[in-house]
A protein has these predicted regions:
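C-terminus-biased signal that marks the final domain/tail of proteins
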Residues: 1-95, 176-332
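Internal mixed beta-strand/loop scaffold within catalytic domains of large alpha/beta enzymes
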Residues: 70-171, 307
Length: 332
């Protein structure tokens, strides 16, 4: 896998180091922080990190930098630098019913060459095939396995430090490689709170849930069963969670517009299809309600839509770049 993703891995390595330098973040500090997650990574996944290191020649802890970058940046550095008014980087929009879910993947447009969709099969005692989006060596919770467990998610920036539990990327791999249903997937995703994330998860039986998580105990997650449709963006819907947001106004207009569009489609015939999800995710009116964000060719550090996915228990529609009807499809 490391060899096939070599270009993306080397590119992300260069970008993360450059961003750290631009923000006056010491690589020594980053290395110290990411090493704190080491004890929470199962041995099989340490072997995975070592395998990428061997395949690419990038040192182990530099691969770890990629695997843990979102946990370190948003779980530790952003809360620690609250007075610095660090920019909102993520703008993902996740939408789902009990049968179909999808999302856009939005980050700095400079991240475009780091992305790839990856399909792989683990040939263990019970083989499992996984399809998900990767950013260098980092796996984001946006994919499906051949047991028809599906997950999408988005980052929520708040000012509470995360724990040093299992990193998001590793949890995502574990969930998609082992879960047979929504409950098993959810248990893994709630096993640590390294940052604030929302998830939508469903399975072949239509056991859909929409989840909000935040990094404090005892009320660090909120789970809603999906009865019609649910939308999750880069904000919290629970007032006690929203109190801790870095920017309480961020993503509210996009949240409202996505809810409006999803409910309109669902109310039309009592279901939400993968094609309707693609249509919703193409919405762009040039305001903060926009879901499909065009890149700014003059500013690669401006957020844009870099990829998207729409899936049900039969197939996955996906693409890199802006959401469009020109998507790939995998039956899985």
């Amino acid at each position: 896998m490391g060899q096939q993703l070599a270009v993306q891995i080397f590119t992300l390595d260069a970008i993360l180091k450059s961003l750290a330098s631009m923000n006056n973040i010491s690589l020594e500090v980053v290395t110290y922080l990411m090493m704190q997650y080491d004890a929470s990574i199962p041995d099989d996944y340490k072997s995975f990190i070592q395998g990428i290191s061997d395949a690419t020649g990038i040192p182990y802890y530099e691969v770890m930098f990629q695997v843990t970058w979102m946990d370190v940046y948003y779980g530790i550095l952003v809360p620690a630098a609250i007075q610095a008014q660090m920019a909102q980087m993520a703008a993902c929009t996740a939408i789902g019913s009990d049968k179909a879910i999808g999302q856009t993947y939005d980050l700095f447009s400079i991240m475009t060459p780091t992305l790839a969709y990856v399909k792989y099969t683990l040939l263990n005692r019970r083989p499992v095939t996984v399809f998900s989006i990767w950013q260098g060596a980092f796996t984001y919770p946006m994919g499906k396995n051949d047991r028809d467990v599906m997950i999408v998610g988005n980052l929520v920036q708040n000012y509470i430090p995360g724990d040093f539990g299992t990193p998001l990327s590793i949890k995502t791999m574990m969930a998609l490689e082992t879960a047979k249903n929504t409950e098993e997937c959810l248990d893994i995703m709630l096993s640590s709170f390294t940052g604030g994330y929302n998830y939508i998860i469903t399975d072949r039986r239509g056991n859909g849930v929409a989840v909000q998580t935040i990094q404090f105990i005892p009320t660090n997650y909120d789970i809603e069963e999906i009865n019609t449709v649910e939308v999750r963006t880069n904000t919290y819907l629970r007032p006690d969670f929203a109190y801790f947001l870095l920017d309480p106004t961020y993503a509210l207009e996009r949240q409202a517009k996505a809810e409006e569009l999803a409910n309109a489609e669902y109310n039309d015939d009592g279901k939400l299809t993968t094609s309707e999800l693609i249509d919703i995710m193409q919405y762009n009116d040039g305001t903060p309600a926009t879901i499909n964000r065009y890149p700014n060719p003059y500013n690669p550090l401006e957020t844009a839509t870099l990829g998207y996915i729409s899936m049900n228990k039969h197939y996955i529609k996906f693409g890199l770049g802006l959401v469009s009807d020109d998507y790939g499809i995998i039956w899985m």
